[in-house]
Swiss-Prot record:
The keyword Cell membrane does not apply. Homodimer. The keyword rRNA processing does not apply. A motif (CCCFC) lies at residues 194-198. This is 4-amino-5-hydroxymethyl-2-methylpyrimidine phosphate synthase. Its EC number is 2.-.-.-. Disruption phenotype: Auxotroph for thiamine. The lineage of its organism: Eukaryota, Fungi, Dikarya, Ascomycota, Taphrinomycotina. Pfam families: NMT1.
Amino acid sequence: MSTNKITFLTNWEATPYHLPIFLAQTRGYYEREGIEVAILEPTNPSDVTALIGSGKVDMGLKAMIHTLAAKARGYPVTSFGSLLNEPFTGLITLKGNGINDFKDIKGKRIGYVGEFGKIQLDDLCSKFGLSPSDYTAIRCGMNIAPAIINGEIDGGIGIECMQQVELERWCVSQGRPRSDVQMLRIDRLANLGCCCFCTILYIAHDEFIAKHPDKIKAFLRAIHSATLDMLKDPVQTYKEYIHFKREMGSELHREQFERCFAYFSHDISNVPRDWNKVTNYSKRLGIIPQDFEPNCTNGYLTWELDPDEKDPMGKQEAIAEIQDEIKQKGGVFSGNSLRYVEPANL
């Protein structure tokens, strides 16, 4: 085996927002940087932090809240960059299912992806005068949208650019308007000020980072090049992604990519403000101890980073407007490449 080989585990099966990872492969950026990256997909997304944290895989992707929890549970992992920033996440349901505000979950069947989704739901129950016994929790994994469609649950925790799009497309196929899909955003319900707990991160085993800093930097340079290519020409780079991953050519995946586009990190950096918010939120949920320090670094990024966002709440509102316009008019495949800010290095 080449000593320059890196094993990389995605957070679940190939999705539209994995494009930069595969594009860096197809455009030869890993090879240019002198590394060979074996891209792996998990059969169970819940195994990702354990596999990386045990050293069986070098690096991969995971959401921020899972990355914090993994370190608190003894898995030595650290985030060294971000892929998808603050995708809107919340309780998704269909009009007519009887859930118009959070209190309406009483007596309902509510789906969640994994362990921390249940913890978040129970925390919100205490905020809204409910108890965990007031609703039926059903673990659905990544299949929130099909579970709603099949009537197995009345609503479930999902991401706007993924599960919500899947449910919207089903509504259209049934002659129903997209507006029949509703989301109660967790950041608003919990007064977080951001949806950063579901930011998708690049993470690695601490020992791998310590022993191979040059590999981390090389990987990031390759990913940065691929990310900038994607932001400059999303249509062409997505065509290349389809050539590598045929399933990405479906109308569902193309639309999910359009809705992911505004969330892509431009400079791949960890955002300290977001990490502080999610760390404090995780402490409140009891996921990590009170003395926990964020397990992230920007020390391996070798380019100028974007300036700190001066109005993060304003950014959230602007992105919400962008996402609504894309939902109504189409995104990059309709010539609409809206995103919140222009990348600094384009």
